[in-house]
Structures are given as C-alpha cells and as structure tokens.
C-alpha cells in the first residue's frame, strides 16, 4: 500500500517553520565560519598579513553573501519554483524543454545535467570538509589531540551515513533548535570579538575588497576562491525550497542566518587584528577558553546536521534524475509516513560514505581539503544562472533589456567565482570535477541506452490498435484471467504481450496495458493520475501519471480504476518485460563504450517489480534480448 503524504508547510506556524528551515536549509552555509575566513587569510600569506588584508577579506565575504545569496537566490531564484519545488532539475522541468528548438533544448538540458552532477560531486566533499573543520577544534583545546582528528572525523562520518537507513524523522525535530543555538552562538561570539576591535567594521566598505584584490594581483584568484567558501551553501536554499517555501526561507535568512554569519566573520576579523597567530583557527580563538569544549560539541553537531542536509539533498536529486530517466533505477525506501522528502537510497549512501571517508583519509586536514572544495558548487551556480535567465526570458516574458542586464549581472558574478576556483584545479579541484564527470557520463549513457532500447522495441512491435484487431486470429487459447502488461512504449504493443501471443499463442480474457509516465512537475493530483481507455477485444489501456517526487506504487493507484470496470485487481497477474542488453562485441566507437556502460547499469538496476511495487507472487517476467 502506498504511503500517504501530506504537505503542510503552508500551515506551519511561521516561527516553527523558520526554526525548521534553520535546521534543514542553512546547515551548509551556516558552518562555513569554521573555515572560510581562515582560508582567505592563508591565501594572502598566512601570518604575514596586514589589517588592510583582513578588512578586504571581510569585504569580499560580506558582498559575496549579499550579492550571491541574498540578491541572486533569496530575491530572484527562489521565485522560480516548479509547483513549490526548487533545485536545478526542477528548473529544467519548469522550462518545458520539449517545446524548445532542438539546439536550445540540448544546451539547456546539458546545463541542468552538468549542474546536477556538480552538486552530487559536491555532496562527497561537503560532509568531509564540514566535520573535519569542526573536529579540528581539538588542536585548539590541546595540541596533543592532533592525531585524533582524522580518526574521530571518520567515526562521525561513518555514524552519519550508517544512520541514514533508520530514517531521520525522529531526530530531525532537534535540528532546528540546535541550529538556532548554533546561529545564536555565532552572533554572540561575533559581537564579543567586534567589541574588542570595532575598527574591523570598516570591512563593510566594498572598496576594501577591491583594494585587497588589486594589492595582490597574483593571488586574486586564490583570494576570491577562498572567500567563495563562505557562500558554497547558497545553492541549498533553492534545492530545499520544497521543504518550507520562499517566504519562510527568506525570513530565516534575512533575520537570523545572514546577520549571525556576518557578525561572526567580523568577530573573527577582530581577533585576527589583535592576534595574527589566531590564523591557526580564528573561529575557535574567538571563543573564550572556558567554552571551547561546549563549542566543539556544538560545532560537531552543526556539521553533522549540515552533512545530513547534503546527503538528503543528494538522495532527492538522485530520485528526480531516476524518475526523469537520467539515472538507472535504484531501490528507494521512504523512511517517513508523513514526508515524501525523507528517503533512503542504499547504494548511493554507501558510495557517498566510502568516497567521503576516502577524501578525509587522503587530505587529512581542512586546509588541504579546501583546495578541492567549492569548485563544483561554483559551476553549479553558473548552470543555475543559465537556466534562471532562460526562465525569465521564456516563461516570465521580461523585457529584453531587463533579461540582458540580469544575465550580465549574474554571469559576471558567477564567472568571477568559477574562474577563481579554477586556480584550485591542480591542488585537488580535479577531484569533484572528476566525480561530476563520471556522473554526467553515467547520465548520458543511461539516457542514450534507454532511447536505444525504446527504438529497438518500436522496430519489432506494432501499434497497439493493430494488435487488438488481429488478437483473436493470432491466439489458439484464451486464459480466463486478467493480465496487466506494463509498457514503456506508449501506443505500441508491449513486447511481453506480443511475445506471449506470437510464441505461446495465448490471449487473456482481459488485457490491461499500463503505461507509467513521469510528469515534468513534482506532483500529480489524484484526479489527474489515471486515464483509462477502453479498446476492443477485452483490452483496456491505462495511463498512470506521477510527479517526479512521488512514490510510484502501481497496484494501489491502478486498483480502484480496475474495480470500477469489474476487474478484481487482487486476482490479476502482472506481466512485465525484462530486457537482456547485448552490447557490441567490439569497442571501436564512443557509442560502443556507452552501450557497454548501459548494459552494466541495466544489469544492476532495480527491477521493475520492485520499482513499481508489484506483488511478486502475481508477477511474471518475460526476458528478451535487445542488441544495441
């Protein structure tokens, strides 16, 4: 039986919703004070920095937060929701690309897939960077604890990933209050630091940032790339739009998260002005020694929450890609009876865990990991801007001058960050790009393979109407049962049905042809989910439509429609085709490589009986070869 989900974010009390948003949406960007300013100071020369350098870094961080997060995401991009959902793939589906010219369609689709792959690549680095930065506070408490940092980081990450299969619904209610305490601590510590050196507020002047960049022209890219670490969580605001809605996220950002972050950055800057040696860890040095241990535990909890949010986001992104046909089906388990966002993708979870732990063991310190961190998000932000400008132009019909001005503004900002992050390429930035490249290759291989399978099926099957007309003449016997055939061929005859008729010469008293379609929106209402067409000869065609965020349970949705037509759904059998992919014998072209990759993915993909929730005791699979 399908789970019944309710979406009640609009009914939630504003304060409760905003507290929840702090726990889910701002985990990544909220933990950036652990490392962002520190990396900026290291970029300008470690302990050999001037007060002007500190002011400049604070200026760059401040105006990056204002322009990229507040203006771009909160004021603009969050308005581009697809039935309440956000994220790069939601924006792709919102553009309704099938109505576009072929060249533009592929350009925008490629941008969306690249952005999605970049975010998945970032999902490997963000938990490692966040948790490692928090636990490095141990060396501030006692240098003797230095050797424990990496083992403890690995243990925390392993615990986070291993707990995913249990679901997070019960503990998620604590995320908001913990993050409220975290942001409150950021603000209090920031005010404490600013009071010791109020002259640090001169860093609000944007000219200070310009001065620092021009003073260190050879390090400009490195400096901007380091400051970009302060906004890497900005994309999460859009990705988590479906959890809380634009107004809730905007209020939580403008009145809680952003002020707390800015106060803390300036507090760290004040400490650096007083003591240049604080560059070893300005976040923890901002805190009085008495509170170091409580702050360490709070920071670790905050980074665990940030990691949890990233993992959940990757799961959600993968589900969207699966339902839209860009990733092979994987077993998705819903861990909540009330919230469809709470899912667990086992294979992906294990891959992420192994990759995250390998990253920690390989880099060992947040200073070295920072060289790899941020580049994937920078390019994801570029793709978001491309898709958003297309949405403004095509759907919102802004005047051309306004579209051009918006495009120039967004692309100038994103290009500065992306080009600055390219300076990290040889120091570790290749890692997230490599991960993203692998994801893109898998997406393209799966999509091309699916298209090849459908093309082969259409070559060797006939239109369903023609099959219905010749059905009686082609059969030697009739089964009194009702058979339900799942088809991905639309108006064509399912391969399983045609093979049963041609090879076994058997027809069923009633045959129900079911096609499952994924709509270009997150949810399809119950009234629009089922369309039934009665055909001749006891055939019934049923089209089921689901949103790309909905659980697909064919029996529960199909049952009422069959019962209304005198068919007992509990007595019917399901017949599904199972393709045995045969790739080329020799690999001589790029498409041959794609075919072999698709064959491997198909062998390891979730079977249709599990994906569609079919009863195993009443499901028959008919295998057939498909040569690519």
Swiss-Prot record:
Membrane topology field: Multi-pass membrane protein
Transmembrane feature ranges: 12-32, 57-77, 106-126, 141-161, 174-194, 219-239, 253-273, 295-315, 343-363, 369-389, 402-422, 425-445
GO CC annotation terms, alphabetical: plasma membrane
Catalytic activity: K(+)(in) + H(+)(in) = K(+)(out) + H(+)(out)
Domain of life: Bacteria
Pfam family, one: K_trans
Record localization: Cell inner membrane
Keywords, in A-Z order: Cell inner membrane, Cell membrane, Ion transport, Membrane, Potassium, Potassium transport, Symport, Transmembrane, Transmembrane helix, Transport
Annotated function: Transport of potassium into the cell. Likely operates as a K(+):H(+) symporter.
Family: Belongs to the HAK/KUP transporter (TC 2.A.72) family.
Protein name: Probable potassium transport system protein Kup
């Amino acid at each position: 039986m399908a789970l019944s989900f309710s979406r009640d974010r609009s009914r939630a009390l504003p304060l409760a919703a905003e507290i929840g948003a702090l726990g889910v949406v701002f985990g990544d960007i909220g933990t950036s004070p652990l490392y962002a300013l520190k990396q900026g100071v290291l970029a300008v020369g470690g302990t050999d920095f001037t007060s002007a350098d500190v002011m400049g870094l604070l200026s760059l961080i401040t105006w990056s937060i204002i322009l990229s997060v507040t203006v771009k995401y909160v004021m603009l991009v969050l308005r581009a929701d697809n039935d309440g959902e956000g994220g790069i793939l939601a924006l792709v589906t919102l553009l309704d690309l099938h109505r576009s010219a072929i060249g533009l369609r592929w350009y925008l689709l490629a941008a969306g897939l690249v952005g999605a792959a970049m975010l998945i690549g970032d999902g490997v680095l963000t938990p490692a960077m966040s948790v490692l930065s928090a636990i490095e506070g141990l060396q501030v408490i006692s240098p003797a604890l230095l050797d424990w940092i990496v083992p403890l980081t690995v243990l925390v990450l392993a615990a986070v990933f291993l707990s995913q299969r249990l679901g997070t619904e019960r503990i998620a209610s604590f995320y908001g209050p913990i993050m409220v305490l975290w942001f409150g601590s950021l603000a209090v510590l920031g005010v404490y630091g600013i009071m010791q050196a109020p002259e640090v507020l001169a860093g609000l002047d944007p000219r200070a940032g310009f001065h620092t960049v021009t003073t260190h022209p050879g390090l400009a890219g490195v400096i901007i790339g380091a400051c970009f670490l302060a906004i890497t969580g900005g994309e999460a605001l859009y990705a988590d739009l479906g959890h809380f809605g634009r107004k809730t996220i905007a209020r939580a950002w403008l009145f809680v998260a952003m002020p707390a972050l800015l106060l803390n950055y300036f507090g760290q800057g004040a400490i650096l002005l007083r003591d240049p040696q604080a560059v070893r860890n300005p976040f923890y040095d901002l805190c009085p020694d008495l509170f170091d241990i409580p702050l360490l535990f709070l920071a670790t909890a905050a980074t665990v929450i940030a990691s949890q949010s990233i993992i959940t986001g990757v799961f959600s992104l993968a589900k969207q890609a699966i339902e839209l046909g860009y990733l092979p089906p994987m077993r998705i388990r819903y861990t909540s009876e009330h919230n469809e966002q709470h899912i667990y993708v086992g294979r992906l979870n294990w891959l992420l865990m192994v990759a995250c732990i390998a990253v920690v063991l390989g880099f060992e310190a947040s200073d070295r990991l920072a060289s790899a961190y941020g580049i994937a998000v920078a390019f994801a932000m570029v793709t978001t801007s491309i898709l958003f400008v297309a949405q403004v132009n095509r759907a919102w019909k802004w005047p051309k001058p306004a579209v051009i001005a918006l495009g120039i503004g967004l692309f100038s900002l994103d290009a500065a960050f992306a080009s600055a992050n390219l300076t990290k390429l040889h120091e570790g930035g290749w890692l997230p790009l490599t991960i993203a490249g692998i994801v893109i290759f898998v997406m393209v291989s799966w999509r091309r393979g699916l298209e090849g399978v459908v093309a082969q099926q259409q070559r060797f099957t006939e239109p369903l109407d023609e099959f219905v007309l010749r059905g009686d003449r082609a059969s030697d016997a009739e089964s009194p049962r009702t058979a339900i055939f799942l088809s991905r061929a639309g108006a064509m005859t399912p391969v399983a049905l045609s093979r049963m008729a041609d090879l076994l010469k058997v027809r069923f008293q009633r045959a129900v042809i079911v096609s499952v379609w994924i709509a270009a929106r997150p949810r399809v209402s119950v009234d629009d989910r089922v369309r039934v067409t009665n055909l001749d000869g006891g055939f019934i065609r049923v089209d089921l439509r689901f949103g790309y965020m909905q659980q697909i349970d064919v029996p529960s949705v199909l049952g009422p429609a069959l019962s209304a037509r005198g068919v007992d759904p509990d007595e019917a059998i399901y017949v599904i085709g199972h393709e045995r992919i045969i790739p080329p014998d020799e690999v001589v072209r790029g498409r041959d490589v794609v075919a072999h990759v698709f064959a491997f993915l198909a062998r390891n993909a979730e079977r249709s009986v599990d994906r569609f929730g079919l009863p195993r005791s009443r499901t028959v699979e008919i295998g057939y070869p498909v040569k690519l």
